[in-house]
């Protein structure tokens, strides 16, 4: 007796499995971007003999993302109020002054100005 031909359902399952295998090769893992290397570099500048746990690094990364989003949102709002379509360093500076308290804002503005000056001179 000749072997039975594969049923329709079995053929579909086999073709789905083959399709899944071919897409697995093409699928690349998405890179998770974080500020952890930069946070680590700053930590080593300030306290060379101190380490940081992965949980603490995760918290610091969330903090940096949160502050970044707040500054970006405030700068966007300021640009909108002044009917501007571009966020410039002036909007960022004003947003920082509005968001951060007292002395912290002054230090942030001076460090930001220093960074922008260094960047423009390197070009």
Curated annotation (Swiss-Prot):
GO terms for molecular function: DNA binding; protein heterodimerization activity; protein-containing complex binding; structural constituent of chromatin. Pfam families: Histone. Monoubiquitination of Lys-118 gives a specific tag for epigenetic transcriptional activation and is also prerequisite for histone H3 'Lys-4' and 'Lys-79' methylation. Keywords: Chromosome, DNA-binding, Glycoprotein, Isopeptide bond, Nucleosome core, Nucleus, Ubl conjugation. CDD domains: HFD_H2B. One of its GO terms (cellular component) is nucleosome. It is found in: Nucleus; Chromosome. Residues 1-32 are annotated as: Disordered. Glycans are attached at residue 110. The keyword DNA-binding applies. There is a cross-link at residue 118 (Glycyl lysine isopeptide (Lys-Gly) (interchain with G-Cter in ubiquitin)). Residues 9-32 have a biased composition (Basic residues). SUPFAM superfamilies: Histone-fold (SSF47113). Core component of nucleosome. Nucleosomes wrap and compact DNA into chromatin, limiting DNA accessibility to the cellular machineries which require DNA as a template. Histones thereby play a central role in transcription regulation, DNA repair, DNA replication and chromosomal stability. DNA accessibility is regulated via a complex set of post-translational modifications of histones, also called histone code, and nucleosome remodeling. The nucleosome is a histone octamer containing two molecules each of H2A, H2B, H3 and H4 assembled in one H3-H4 heterotetramer and two H2A-H2B heterodimers. The octamer wraps approximately 147 bp of DNA. Belongs to the histone H2B family. This is Histone H2B.
């Amino acid at each position: 007796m000749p072997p039975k031909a594969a049923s329709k359902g079995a053929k579909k399952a086999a073709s789905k499995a083959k399709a899944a295998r071919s897409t697995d090769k093409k699928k690349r893992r998405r890179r998770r971007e974080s500020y952890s290397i930069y946070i680590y570099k700053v930590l080593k500048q300030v306290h060379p003999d101190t380490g940081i746990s992965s949980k603490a690094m995760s918290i610091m990364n969330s903090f940096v993302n949160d502050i970044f989003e707040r500054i970006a949102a405030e700068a966007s709002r300021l640009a909108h109020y002044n009917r501007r379509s571009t966020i410039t360093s002036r909007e960022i500076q004003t947003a920082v002054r509005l968001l951060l308290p007292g002395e912290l804002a002054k230090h942030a503005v001076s460090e930001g100005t220093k960074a922008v000056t260094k960047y423009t001179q390197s070009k």
